[in-house]
């Protein structure tokens, strides 16, 4: 069986070796954490020569300075019993340590046997007594800010500027109404032009339909004319034969008459045919020109309508 050696409660030796190997444990919840718990936590870093637990803090005395510094590095900032421990070397005061703890540590080093509980109670009593004697800091009153009053000349200036703004608005309204009237008149003229163009297009389409119907009917009429001219030549030939049976003079006369009669018909047909073709080609060219002109007018009217819509 291994017996656990109890450590001493002496942690206030003034020799330099003891001071440099002593560890201060601050912000310790002494209501929950006991001396045995502190010894078990810090004994893993080296041999603990002494341990003393007080209200809110404790001291651990190591036999070697190296063990003390290892404990500070390993346990500083550890959360124990819901509180973060503030651990550092007792011989090296920390700047951010509370004033009460610093004075307690210096008081420890001043004497060999010192009652820590008495010192802590005395220090707290003096601290609260000093705070009670301090006068409260007076709170400065808020200085009321005075708002500048509106002067009369400013009001007059505002009144003088109002008619200018109204005049500018009225001029803008009149110019806008004039532009609207101009746009409406332009739209009316464009509408009338469009109606005229549509009527012209309708007339041209009707004319084209009539020409197409006439062209369809013309080939049949030409064939009928050719057949009638052929029948007339045969009849004239029969007459010539009869005249030949009657006499030579009659036969010669009939031959000459038959040979002379078709020539004027061919001339008349050719004369009649050529002007009709020329007239048809001219009519077709005129109609195509009118169609192209009407299409251009339609495109121009559409462009103007689009521009008017964008302006509106």
Swiss-Prot record:
GO cellular component: catalytic step 2 spliceosome; nucleus
Tissue and organ expression note: Widely expressed. Expressed in brain, testis, lung, spleen and kidney. Weakly expressed in liver.
Biased composition (Basic and acidic residues): 214-226, 293-303
Residues making up the signal peptide according to the UniProt record: none
Highest taxon above the source species: Eukaryota
Residue stretches in coiled coil: 184-216
BP terms from Gene Ontology: cholesterol homeostasis; mRNA processing; negative regulation of transcription by RNA polymerase II; RNA splicing
Family membership: Belongs to the RRM HNRPC family. RALY subfamily.
Protein name: RNA-binding protein Raly
Species per Swiss-Prot/TrEMBL record: Mus musculus
Taxonomic lineage from the root: Eukaryota, Metazoa, Chordata, Craniata, Vertebrata
Name of the gene: Raly
């Amino acid at each position: 069986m291994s017996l656990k050696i109890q450590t001493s409660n002496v942690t206030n030796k003034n020799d330099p070796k003891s001071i440099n190997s002593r560890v201060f444990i601050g912000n310790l919840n002494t209501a929950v954490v006991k001396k045995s718990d502190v010894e078990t936590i810090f004994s893993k870093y080296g041999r603990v020569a002494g341990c003393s637990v007080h209200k809110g803090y404790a001291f651990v005395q190591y036999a070697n300075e190296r063990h003390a510094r290892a404990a500070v590095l390993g346990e500083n900032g550890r959360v124990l019993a819901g509180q973060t421990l503030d651990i550092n070397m007792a011989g090296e005061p920390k700047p951010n340590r509370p004033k009460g703890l610093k004075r307690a540590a210096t008081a420890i080093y001043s004497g060999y046997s010192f009652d820590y509980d008495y010192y802590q109670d005395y220090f707290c009593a003096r601290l609260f007594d000093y705070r009670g004697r301090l006068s409260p800091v007076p709170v400065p009153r808020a200085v009321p800010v005075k708002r500048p009053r509106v002067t009369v000349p400013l009001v007059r200036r505002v009144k003088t500027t109002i008619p200018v703004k109204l005049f500018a608005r009225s001029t803008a309204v009149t110019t806008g109404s004039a532009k609207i009237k101009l746009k409406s008149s332009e739209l009316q003229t464009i509408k009338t032009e469009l109606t005229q163009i549509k009527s012209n297009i309708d007339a041209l389409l009707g004319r084209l339909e009539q020409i197409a119907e006439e062209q369809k009917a013309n080939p049949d009429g030409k064939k009928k004319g050719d057949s009638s001219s052929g029948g007339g030549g045969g009849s004239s030939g029969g007459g010539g034969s009869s005249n030949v049976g009657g006499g030579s003079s009659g036969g010669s006369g009939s031959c000459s008459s038959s040979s002379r009669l078709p020539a004027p018909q061919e001339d008349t047909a050719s004369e009649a045919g050529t002007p009709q073709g020329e007239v048809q080609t001219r009519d077709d060219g005129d109609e195509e020109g009118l169609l192209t002109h009407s299409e251009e007018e339609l495109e121009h009217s559409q462009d103007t309508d689009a521009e008017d819509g964008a302006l509106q």
